[in-house]
Amino acid sequence: MRIDTSALCDIYSDQVDVVEPIFSSFGGASSFYGKITTVKCFESNGLIASVLEEEGQGRVLLIDGGGAVRRALIDAELAQLALDNGWEGIIVYGAVRQLDVLETLDIGIHALAPIPVGADDNEIGEVDTPVNFGGVTFFPEDYVYADLTGIILSPELLDLAELEE
């Protein structure tokens, strides 16, 4: 289903938080939504790879990379792993790389910027902890909705049937 964050903001203005417009879309899917799983790490993506090995149906991986853009936390291999395991999308408060491949994959990917340098593969960081960036606090189990216009957050699953009316 196509997500329209503008319409969702109009319908659920009292229920959603809007993430500051600091992200760009790099994946092949223009919109996505799901229940958040958070990873907090810095310039290392080993923990990200471990989480992406899990079943991702109905889930979005939200990565707090501290806003660092010196090393890419998501590359083509990790994006393909996410797609293979059914993840709906990935949001990276950090950088990504291999854009020519990312844009061909049917998964939503939002990040701050691209850079060709890869991350370390250490499994250092935290999983399912609250993270704060873009003017909002993301809690594990919250729901995130993203499209080319922006990213919004809700503590509850929104009724997307409202978009069709």
UniProtKB/Swiss-Prot annotation:
Compartment(s): Cytoplasm
Membrane-spanning parts: none
Pfam families attached to this UniProt entry: RraA-like
Keywords: Cytoplasm
GO MF term (any one): endoribonuclease inhibitor activity
A GO BP annotation: regulation of RNA metabolic process
GO CC annotation, single: cytoplasm
Alphabetical list of InterPro entries matching this protein: RraA (IPR010203), RraA/RraA-like (IPR005493), RraA/RraA-like_sf (IPR036704), RraA_gpbac (IPR014339)
Similarity-based family: Belongs to the RraA family.
Subunit and partners: Homotrimer. Binds to both RNA-binding sites in the C-terminal region of Rne and to RhlB.
Physiological role: Globally modulates RNA abundance by binding to RNase E (Rne) and regulating its endonucleolytic activity. Can modulate Rne action in a substrate-dependent manner by altering the composition of the degradosome. Modulates RNA-binding and helicase activities of the degradosome.
Protein name as catalogued: Regulator of ribonuclease activity A
Lineage: Bacteria, Pseudomonadati, Pseudomonadota, Gammaproteobacteria, Pasteurellales
